[in-house]
């Protein structure tokens, strides 16, 4: 074979001693030779060592109180949801650590995937991202509305796994301990409780396809994404230890809860349980309500941990703007500091930003765009105005009826 002989001299692998006739390939280096078998062996050793490093990391998972403290430093409000997530994530990685360190297990511990229900902008995606970052595990986000069942135009569910593998730099062992967040899961609910005679391409069929990878299976993933074809090489990944967090707004589910609790939406009825505000209905959601909304029982059964998030108030949004480690106000203050300019927000300005986000029904995710709108002209002009030392954002500036106040050195 080409490259195995040097001027008809017998070449031996410097590591195992085999000659070129005993192996498929020998690669020449600077005074050394290595055969294909030793290359494969070294790759296997590296893979095993990396897998052991992953397992060692899992044995040091922060306890629920420690995870909650991490979430508290980045996420405002949603205390009940954060507690539920902290416990579920700790139990998940504790299960992996102990199961894989002990060969003989009397009890088969099932994993506890998570369903998050809450309005747009309430922090579902950010909570999942923060957990993955704090644990230093691969993380991927998928949009359920882009998925279709096999045989239809759209994205196969296996492509979700490819995103996780890519996040792990194609280290499959590390990806197998990662976290996947599937957003907009409510958008693939069945259209009503009665099964249609037509194919529900983006509904029950997608739930069934997701169910397989969520509950745990060895999946074949196309390394370049897209649809599978017979000649394509596949990446094999075991999903039994991947934590799946799915989330959605589930608009209208509070009405299902009201009906179950005996409170009529129209007319009169006897209240079996008095609930004071809409956000409290979210804390009363049970699997029966989710099934009535349109998720199939088998799918719900693989998501035993329910974390309900509440609508954020003006006060919550103001705290989000100012208090977390990576608060938006701190980010923009840092940006302007690079130009030697201080940035201040009046309290009324912060409240006006929060109020706009609520009116637009964008929640926390809409805060940045509102600040960008308010500060666009300012950030365009400031770099060219060397005499400006401080900028103050007022309520009128947020409302668009006046400009921010500039202070100069003179």
Swiss-Prot record:
Question: Self-association or partners: how does it assemble?
Answer: Component of the ClpX-ClpP complex. Forms a hexameric ring that, in the presence of ATP, binds to fourteen ClpP subunits assembled into a disk-like structure with a central cavity, resembling the structure of eukaryotic proteasomes.
* Example of a GO biological process term: proteolysis involved in protein catabolic process
Question: What keywords are annotated for this sequence in UniProt?
Answer: ATP-binding, Chaperone, Metal-binding, Nucleotide-binding, Zinc
InterPro entries associated with the record: AAA+_ATPase, ATP-dep_Clp_protease_ClpX, ATPase_AAA_core, Clp_ATPase_C, Clp_protease_ATP-bd_su_ClpX, ClpX_bact, P-loop_NTPase, Znf_CppX_C4
Q: Which family does it belong to?
A: Belongs to the ClpX chaperone family.
Where the record annotates domain ClpX-type ZB, the positions are 1-54
Q: Name the encoding gene, please.
A: clpX
Protein name, as recorded: ATP-dependent Clp protease ATP-binding subunit ClpX
Any one Gene Ontology cellular component term annotated for this protein: HslUV protease complex
List the NCBIfam families hit by this protein, alphabetically: clpX (TIGR00382), PRK05342.1 (NF003745)
Q: Which is one Pfam family of this protein? A: zf-C4_ClpX
Tell me yes or no: is DNA-binding among this UniProt entry's keywords. no
- Annotated residues for binding of ATP: 119-126
Q: Where does Zn(2+) bind?
A: 13, 16, 35, 38
Q: What does this protein do?
A: ATP-dependent specificity component of the Clp protease. It directs the protease to specific substrates. Can perform chaperone functions in the absence of ClpP.
Q: Which residues form a coiled coil?
A: none
**What molecular functions are annotated in GO for this chain?**
ATP binding; ATP hydrolysis activity; ATP-dependent protein folding chaperone; protein dimerization activity; unfolded protein binding; zinc ion binding
Q: Which PROSITE patterns match?
A: CLPX_ZB
């Amino acid at each position: 074979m080409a490259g195995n002989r040097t001027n008809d001299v017998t070449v031996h692998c410097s590591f195992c001693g085999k000659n070129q006739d005993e192996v498929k390939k020998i690669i020449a280096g600077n005074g050394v030779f290595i055969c294909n078998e030793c290359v494969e062996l070294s790759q296997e050793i590296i893979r095993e060592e990396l897998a052991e490093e992953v397992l060692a990391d899992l044995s040091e998972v922060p306890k629920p109180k420690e995870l909650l403290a991490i979430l508290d430093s980045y996420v405002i409000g949603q205390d009940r949801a954060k507690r539920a997530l902290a416990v579920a994530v700790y139990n998940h990685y504790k299960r992996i650590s102990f199961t894989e360190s002990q060969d003989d297990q009397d009890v088969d511990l099932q994993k506890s995937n998570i369903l998050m229900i809450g309005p747009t902008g309430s922090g579902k995606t950010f909570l999942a991202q923060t957990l993955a970052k704090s644990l230093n595990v691969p993380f991927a986000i998928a949009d359920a509305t882009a998925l279709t069942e096999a045989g239809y135009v759209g994205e196969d569910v296996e492509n979700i796994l490819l995103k996780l593998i890519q996040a792990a730099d194609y280290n499959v062992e590390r990806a197998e301990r990662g976290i996947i967040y599937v957003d907009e899961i409510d958008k693939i609910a069945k259209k009503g409780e009665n099964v249609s005679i037509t194919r529900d391409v983006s509904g029950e069929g997608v739930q069934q396809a997701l169910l397989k990878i969520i509950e745990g299976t060895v999946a074949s993933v196309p390394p370049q994404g897209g649809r599978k074809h017979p000649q394509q090489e596949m990446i094999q990944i075991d999903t039994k230890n991947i934590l799946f967090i799915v989330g959605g707004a589930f608009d209208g589910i509070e009405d299902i809860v009201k009906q179950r609790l005996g409170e009529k939406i129209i007319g009169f009825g006897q209240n079996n349980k008095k609930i004071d505000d809409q956000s409290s209905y979210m804390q009363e959601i049970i699997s029966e309500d989710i099934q009535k909304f349109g998720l199939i029982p088998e799918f719900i059964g693989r998501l035993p941990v329910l974390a309900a998030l509440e609508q954020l108030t003006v006060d919550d949004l103001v705290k989000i703007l100012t208090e977390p480690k990576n608060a938006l106000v701190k980010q923009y203050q840092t940006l302007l500091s690079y130009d030697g300019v201080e940035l201040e927000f009046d309290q009324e300005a912060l409240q006006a930003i929060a109020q706009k986000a609520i009116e637009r029904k964008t929640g926390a995710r809409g805060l940045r765009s509102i600040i960008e709108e308010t500060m666009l002209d300012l950030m365009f002009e400031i770099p060219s105005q060397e005499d400006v030392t401080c900028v103050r954002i007022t309520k009128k500036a947020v409302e668009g009826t006046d400009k921010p106040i500039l202070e100069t050195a003179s």
